[in-house]
Every structure is written in C-alpha cells, then in structure tokens.
Amino acid sequence: MLIWLVELANHVQFFNLFRYITFRTGAAMFTAALIVFLFGPKIIASLKVRQGKGQPIRADGPQTHFKKSGTPTMGGLMILAGIVGSSLLWADLSNVYVVATLLVTLGFGAIGFYDDYLKVTKQSDKGFSGKARLAIEFLIAGIAVFFMMEAAKISAPQGPHLATSIAFPFFKDALLNVGYFFIVFGGFVIVSAGNAVNLTDGLDGLAIVPVMIASAAFGLIAYLAGNAVFSGYLQINFVPGTGELAVILGSVIGAGLGFLWFNAPPAAIFMGDTGSLALGGLIGTVAVATKHEIVMVIIGGLFVMETLSVIIQVFWYKRTKKRVFLMAPIHHHFEKKGWTESQVVIRFWIIAVGLAMLGLATLKLR
C-alpha cells in the first residue's frame, strides 16, 4: 500500500526509497516482528482463557511432552497478523503474485484454524476430515496457480511456454511444458508444502526456524527471478513481478522472529495448524511462482524428510505390521532414542541451513 507514496517522490525525496524492493523487504520484516511483539501477549492470554486445556497431547508420544499440557495453540494467528498486516503496508497489492500468495496463506490458515478448533473443543488429535481438508486445499491452490499462470503468460519473455512449464535446476533453459496440467502440478506442490511444514511442527521452535531459513532463501530467489539482469546472469527463468514476493517473505521472517520469542522452550504457545499450513502453503506458492518447485525439495529438504518418514512408516506398517521408526514424524523417533528436545531442534536447524545453502548453490550450477 505504501508503495503508492512513490508518486510523491518528486516532492519528497524520502519516498523514493519505496521504489526499492530491498528497502520494503527490510521494512516488512521489522513491521511484522513489531506486530507480533505488540499483540502477541494479548493473543496468548486470550487463547489461554478460551481454550482451557489447550492443545491435546498425543498419548503415545514422548513422556517429556506431557508437561506441555495446557499450552494454548492457534499461535499461527499471531504469525498471520504479522505477515498480512506487514504485507498490506509494504507489498504491491496490484501484483498478481502477491495477491495469489496472500490468498493461499489466508486460505490455508483458515483451514488450519478450523482444524485446531476441532482438536481443542474435542480434546482430540483428530481434527478436520483428511479428504475434505485436502480437497479444499487443492481448490485454493489451484485457483492461485491458475491466476499466476495467466499472469506469466502475459509478462514473461517466454510467454505461454514458461507459464505452463516445469523448470529443472542444473540445466540452462530446461523446461517441460505440461500445458494446463501445470495447475495440478502447482497445486500439488503448494498442498504438499503446506502439509510438510504441518508435520514438522511437533517440537518447540522446530518448524518456525526452518521456515524462516527457507523464506530467506526463497526471498533471494524471488528477487533474482524478478530481475532481468540478475536472472540473465544466473541463467534462471525471468518471471517479471515475482521480485515483489521478497517483501512477503521478509514479513514471514519478521513474524517468525516475533513468534519464536514466545515459542522458545518452554513454549508459551504453539503455532498449530493455523500457522504451519499457512506458512508451508506460502513457501510452496512462491516456489511455483518463481519456477523453483524442484529446488524447493532441496531448500525444504527437512520438511521432505519429515513427510517421507510418515509415508514410509504408514506404508511399511500396513504391509508388515512393523514400524521402521520408533515413532513418526522422524523428530519423535530421535526423541524416543534418547535425544533431548533441544538436541533434536538445534540439529534439525543445522540441517535446514545446510540444505538452504545447497539449494541456493544450484542457482549458479548451469
């Protein structure tokens, strides 16, 4: 919204700063953190009163988790307030990619909120029906992908070909044109990202820091992909307008820092599905917009690892009635093996940093 003040730059030189994505990204980060810091305590107090017993703890989980009983969930509301409030101020709201990303973020956040509500009111880890939840997620993601695809057809130098193509890292101009099937592919990427982050959110601080790391990496990718000079130099696909997504990702980092203040162990609040689904969907949407869906598998490798551990566990148990892991997702497996919660969390953070650096390295490998 404040980008419109650029029109006054001829009269007030300071407003010229609003032209620059880098300035607005930094401002969005600061604003989002400030929003969470200011309103966080009130939101936590309100949720604690309304929820009573807080988020239900899995009976088959590690024994150390039972002391967390009574901790409120739905902390994602704080994160969403920071992201949306900051983005409305600093991002270009006429940008299709910005609107699509906020649509997915709010849509997935609403699904997560309803899921959290059911879990809290029923005091059960069973929330929203899995099939219904996935169907709504795919609908929201599909709408977002369609509009981003149509925007790319008009603005991208390669036009319709790039808009409906899957890009591959390591190879220059390696594109697989799948036509309108790209809506299905893009929707799958976004939904998978949302649920992968959701599965990772099982320990204090475990999900939010890797989300911030991935956001920083994709913030750089968005800025480069939206810049004709930088994308040309790196030989990555130029998608005009995607640079504006760096502003939203800046707000994610700011909101994440604010949330971590309250989520640091012992957590005063959990983000719940409200936050994890929204954040994962947001990152997935940026990956689709910038044509870095496959690179997301590397940068978000920690989330992929968590998801695969669940898939393997369920598949193998159905076939053999035996478990590959002591408990899934895999962070619980390491807890069962004797790692402390802080050991699991910090070591997983280190993995997330390494994977983000590896993912960014692919930008230069052509």
From Swiss-Prot:
Catalyzes the initial step of the lipid cycle reactions in the biosynthesis of the cell wall peptidoglycan: transfers peptidoglycan precursor phospho-MurNAc-pentapeptide from UDP-MurNAc-pentapeptide onto the lipid carrier undecaprenyl phosphate, yielding undecaprenyl-pyrophosphoryl-MurNAc-pentapeptide, known as lipid I. PANTHER family: PHOSPHO-N-ACETYLMURAMOYL-PENTAPEPTIDE-TRANSFERASE, PHOSPHO-N-ACETYLMURAMOYL-PENTAPEPTIDE-TRANSFERASE HOMOLOG. Pathway: Cell wall biogenesis; peptidoglycan biosynthesis. Its main location: membrane. PROSITE patterns: MRAY_1, MRAY_2. It is found in: Cell inner membrane. GO terms for biological process: cell division; cell wall organization; peptidoglycan biosynthetic process; regulation of cell shape. The gene is mraY. Its EC number is 2.7.8.13. GO terms for cellular component: plasma membrane. Its cofactor is Mg(2+). It catalyses: UDP-N-acetyl-alpha-D-muramoyl-L-alanyl-gamma-D-glutamyl-meso-2,6-diaminopimeloyl-D-alanyl-D-alanine + di-trans,octa-cis-undecaprenyl phosphate = di-trans,octa-cis-undecaprenyl diphospho-N-acetyl-alpha-D-muramoyl-L-alanyl-D-glutamyl-meso-2,6-diaminopimeloyl-D-alanyl-D-alanine + UMP. InterPro entries: Glycosyl_transferase_4, PNAcMuramoyl-5peptid_Trfase, PNAcMuramoyl-5peptid_Trfase_CS. It is a multi-pass membrane protein. This is Phospho-N-acetylmuramoyl-pentapeptide-transferase. The chain crosses the membrane at residues 27-47, 71-91, 93-113, 134-154, 174-194, 205-225, 245-265, 268-288, 294-314, 343-363. Keywords: Cell cycle, Cell division, Cell inner membrane, Cell membrane, Cell shape, Cell wall biogenesis/degradation, Magnesium, Membrane, Metal-binding, Peptidoglycan synthesis, Transferase, Transmembrane, Transmembrane helix. GO terms for molecular function: metal ion binding; phospho-N-acetylmuramoyl-pentapeptide-transferase activity; UDP-N-acetylmuramoyl-L-alanyl-D-glutamyl-meso-2,6-diaminopimelyl-D-alanyl-D-alanine:undecaprenyl-phosphate transferase activity. Belongs to the glycosyltransferase 4 family. MraY subfamily.
